[in-house]
Swiss-Prot record:
HAMAP family: YdiU_SelO. Its cofactor is Mg(2+); Mn(2+). Its EC number is 2.7.7.-, 2.7.7.108. ATP binds at residues 88, 90-91, 111, 123-124, 174, 181, 260. The lineage of its organism: Bacteria, Pseudomonadati, Pseudomonadota, Alphaproteobacteria, Hyphomicrobiales. Mg(2+) binds at residues 251, 260. Pfam families: SelO. It catalyses: L-seryl-[protein] + ATP = 3-O-(5'-adenylyl)-L-seryl-[protein] + diphosphate; L-threonyl-[protein] + ATP = 3-O-(5'-adenylyl)-L-threonyl-[protein] + diphosphate; L-tyrosyl-[protein] + ATP = O-(5'-adenylyl)-L-tyrosyl-[protein] + diphosphate; L-histidyl-[protein] + UTP = N(tele)-(5'-uridylyl)-L-histidyl-[protein] + diphosphate. GO terms for molecular function: AMPylase activity; ATP binding; magnesium ion binding. Belongs to the SELO family. This is Protein nucleotidyltransferase YdiU. The active site is at residue 250. The gene is ydiU.
């Protein structure tokens, strides 16, 4: 039987200016290298039928399934602060939408499926390395319980793509609750097309924020909800040491999901100024700058929505500014609550922020590994030996004084050691997708057509909060010769 996709397409029913209808460009000999079978079932798809020659052809864009309405979405965006009035899906094509098993509408998009009217002289293709990177990191983020796009499948095309050298081509099937970005609103606002901005806002409200429909100011409620989700999302990034790397407005999802994993990376040693992206020369998107940039992006969204918020533009601007003014508090609450949880503190007390700040300061000075420090503290909560954490600090004595204060603080709460340790282990991952591990996976796949390291890394990262003694090496930071100093978009 044919592979069946229960498409229910809504974005393609919007006016033509929202997208360009374009079919994927067929590829030579598609080979399915990874299928996310649990996600397929969640989407109402049959993984056994997808895992077939016909399925590989669909997932590579060589065959169009019944009910698909392939489109490339239009959007604009600020890239490193500079406005580009037309970007759009230059190498991605939305096949359509399905309603998943939980009643949620999800996009099915092929990334690397060929040129579109928005390709801007690009070939519309993707190389295998960036496809594997996005698959690994997006699925790791999902396992960390951070809102994110998902990866359904990765397919090798049987063709090469020209980058610095000739590289194997691949297509990623990306799943999102939508691919609507701040830049999508900017596309129409820049053209002073208020009817289109309103149609887009109405679509986003119906799709993502239906509770806004019956409020007195639905477009203000929309802005407030996007701000809240972004504040909470960026807080969660910081709590696991994640650096997005390219927080342009066209990479900012109004659904509050992490999207576009090009030059992303996770920190090893804690450093708020850390930058990995090869194109971020000024540190605009450094780890510690991410909350500020999120607010900057949200301000650009507010500018698009102000004409809809109220006929009285002075009142609309005041309302939008008040909504934006909530971001810092919302981010701060989510971030500090998360840090208290990482330290096993069940209540908020005076002095907690100083305690947290002193630990982070010592971690900066001593180049302590972010992930291992907090995971190690989880073990110390269960009365483990202190050396596993002390040895992460260049001068262990810098940690000892702080440890005494932390033990005194936790002793003021009634929870026993086992309860505290379990709570801390549930929020402090042992395993993150470390850059050197991703690089090793990519090299094995690209240079040797060996996907065993890819499969093993995915299996480990699927359970980030679980001790996995047989894979303890995956928790370790890189040796000096393994360090990855820069990451690349791969476009």
């Amino acid at each position: 039987m044919a592979v069946h996709f229960p498409f229910d397409n809504s974005y393609a029913a919007l006016p033509e200016g929202f997208f360009a209808r374009v079919a994927p460009t067929p590829v030579a000999t598609p080979r399915l290298i990874k299928l996310n079978r649990p996600l397929a079932r969640e989407l109402g798809l049959d993984p056994d039928r997808l895992d077939s020659p016909e399925g590989a052809e669909i997932l590579a864009g060589k065959r169009i399934p019944e009910g698909a309405d392939p489109i490339a979405m239009a959007y604009a965006g600020h890239q490193f602060g500079n406005f580009v009035p037309q970007l759009g899906d230059g190498r991605a094509i939305l096949l359509g939408e399905v309603i998943d098993q939980n009643g949620v509408r999800r996009d099915i998009q092929l990334k690397g499926s060929g040129p579109t009217p928005y390709s801007r002289r690009g070939d519309g293709r993707a190389a295998l390395g960036p496809v594997l990177r996005e698959y690994i990191v997006s699925e790791a983020m999902a396992a960390l319980d951070i809102p994110t796009t998902r990866s359904l499948a990765a397919v090798i095309t049987g063709e090469t793509v020209a980058r610095e050298t000739l590289l194997p081509g691949a297509v990623l099937t990306r799943i999102a609750t939508s691919h609507i970005r701040v830049g999508t609103f900017q596309f129409f606002a820049a053209r002073r097309n208020q009817d289109a901005v309103k149609a887009l806002a109405d679509h986003v409200i119906a799709r993502h924020y239906p509770n806004a429909i019956n409020t007195k100011q639905p477009y203000l409620t929309l802005l407030q909800e996007v701000i809240r989700r972004q504040a909470e999302l960026v807080a969660r990034w910081l709590l696991v040491g994640f650096i997005h790397g390219v927080m342009n407005t066209d990479n900012c999802s109004v659904a509050g999901e992490t999207i576009d994993y090009g030059p992303c990376a996770f920190m090893d040693g804690y450093d708020p100024t850390k930058v990995f992206s090869s194109i971020d020369h000024t540190g605009r998107y450094a780890y510690g700058n991410q909350p500020r940039i999120a607010l900057w992006n949200l301000t650009r969204l507010a500018e698009c929505l102000v004409p809809l918020i109220s006929d009285d533009q002075d009142a609309a601007i005041a309302d939008a500014e008040a909504a934006l003014g909530q971001f810092s508090e919302q981010f701060g609450q989510a971030y500090h609550a998360g840090l208290r949880a990482k330290l096993g503190l069940f209540t908020a007390q005076d002095g907690d922020r100083e305690l947290i700040g002193d630990l982070l300061g010592a971690m900066i000075e001593q180049a302590a590994d972010f992930t291992l420090t907090f995971r190690g503290l989880s073990d110390l909560a269960g009365n483990a030996e202190t050396d596993s954490v002390r040895n992460l600090f260049a001068e262990p004595a810098a940690f000892d004084g702080w440890l005494g204060r932390w033990r005194q603080r936790t002793a003021a709460e009634p929870q026993d050691a086992a309860t505290r340790r379990a709570a801390m282990q549930a929020v402090n991952p042992a395993f993150i997708p470390r850059n050197h591990r991703i690089q090793a996976v990519i090299e094995a796949a690209v240079e040797r057509d060996d996907f065993a390291p890819f499969e093993e890394l995915l299996a480990v990262l699927a359970h980030p909060y679980r001790d996995q003694p047989g894979f303890a090496g995956y928790a370790q930071p890189p040796q000096p010769h393994e360090q990855v100093l820069q990451t690349f978009c791969g476009t």
